[in-house]
Amino acid sequence: MYKILFATSEAHPLIKTGGLGDVAGILPIELARLGLEAGIILPAYPACKTHLKNLKEVARLRLPAALEPVRILKGQLLEGPNPVWLVDSPAHFDRPGNPYLNEQGQDWPDNAARFTTFCRAVATLANSPEFDWQPDLIHCNDWQTGLIPPFLAPLRSRPATLFTIHNLAYQGVFSRQQFDALELPSAWWSPAALEFYNQISFIKGGLVFADWLTTVSPTYAKEILTPEFGCGLDGVLRGRSKRLTGILNGADYQRWDPRHDPFIEKRYDQTCWSHKASNKLALQRRYGLPEDDTLPVLGFVGRLVEQKGIDLILGALPKLLAEKIQVVFLGEGEERHQNALQQLASRYPNQIGVSISYDERLAHGVQAGADIFLMPSRFEPCGLTQLYALRYGTVPIARRTGGLSDTIVDATEKNLRQELATGFTFTESSPSALLTAIQRALACYAQSRQWRRLALTGMAQNFSWQTSAKAYFDLYQQLVSQEFSCKNNVL
């Protein structure tokens, strides 16, 4: 059976900052269940070393622009069948902060060098006869792995490459000075290669040189071909549109299911949906709000940035707070949004609760305890939290974009009658459009029988990773059966 090497900058439970970590944590496991040999390779952050068993050195690589040899460590997940390799370069990865930011929340100034070293190591290892686990395909993810396809592209015999765009807005763009310092091929400094408005774009390396591209939802695959969502790369993507597929991310129902969630006050399912009220009371206690299980509680879990529509929520709140509702927030992000929320919580202590952090336990508590989940993203490649909300019977309100369009059925009168509706959607990216959608939801909430049917329809949806993994499995088979060599003469 084929060997797939999943190259990523984060993977749960080793290290996670967002949705990529969730995907990298579950997709290789699901691929293994389908019979593939699926390994994972990522940088050797300190946290990764503590979460692996049987960790040992299997190779040492001397790479251009690296002052010291790079060690390759191999280990095994504590749970799961997948082998894991770590690219151990202490000067690049053994440091505090998260994979991309320092403790002050700023980009590491040497991110270009850090992830060039990672990409060089993966490309060298995967095509080395000394490596005892030769992959048939390397599955690259986001800009941090964007140099792997161009490193491999000119080789006569090499693994196939697949590049997944999780969020096109994050591109790994660096200066010409950094490009020169990295000792990269001079031919890469070209509009046909990695040059991007007189800078180098790591993500463009993946977009131009990978054998196939995927995004994390069918709608986002269409959106990024347009100037509105293409982030300056829509022309490149239109040129590769015949080799671009949208595969919807799945939800990890082992971790996110109210039937067996260890983090919530009272477990429940569709047959005992009334137990959700106990979780609402627990959530109100956690945020110091008056306990009243008849009040509609709206929840937001996510980064406090404009992409996630936090400014739309802030714009809608003054009118919204005239209603008998409560709103809870969990997340961190731009300081101005954090301050605005904290000021509102001080002004409306009985209606607004704020936690400026990311707390996994509390995230589960919000999903279980809220009635309505707010997700007014300006763009959303896929989104996972709306999938969790559906499973927990927490009705999502979302802007009709990306994966939100693919996973939420709007509660029109017709869809409600046919018991197809799962949430409320809106199109215009404005506080007034969001407010209208919330008011629609509150009107439905007042009709308890209709609301219960709506929530239970959402709970019955199945966005499991088995479906997504099978789509990747089929695509891998197609790519591995083809032969690739010297695909781009600019190299």
UniProtKB/Swiss-Prot annotation:
Pathway: Glycan biosynthesis; glycogen biosynthesis. Its EC number is 2.4.1.21. One of its GO terms (biological process) is glycogen biosynthetic process. Keywords: Glycogen biosynthesis, Glycosyltransferase, Transferase. ADP-alpha-D-glucose binds at residue 16. Gene3D superfamilies: Glycogen Phosphorylase B. InterPro entries: Glyco_trans_1, GS/SS, Starch_synth_cat_dom. It catalyses: [(1->4)-alpha-D-glucosyl](n) + ADP-alpha-D-glucose = [(1->4)-alpha-D-glucosyl](n+1) + ADP + H(+). The keyword Glycosyltransferase applies. It comes from the Bacteria. One of its GO terms (molecular function) is alpha-1,4-glucan glucosyltransferase (UDP-glucose donor) activity. The keyword Glycosyltransferase applies. Belongs to the glycosyltransferase 1 family. Bacterial/plant glycogen synthase subfamily. NCBIfam families: glgA, PRK00654.1-2. Synthesizes alpha-1,4-glucan chains using ADP-glucose. PANTHER family: ALPHA AMYLASE DOMAIN-CONTAINING PROTEIN (PTHR45825:SF11), GRANULE-BOUND STARCH SYNTHASE 1, CHLOROPLASTIC/AMYLOPLASTIC (PTHR45825). This is Glycogen synthase 2. The gene is glgA2.
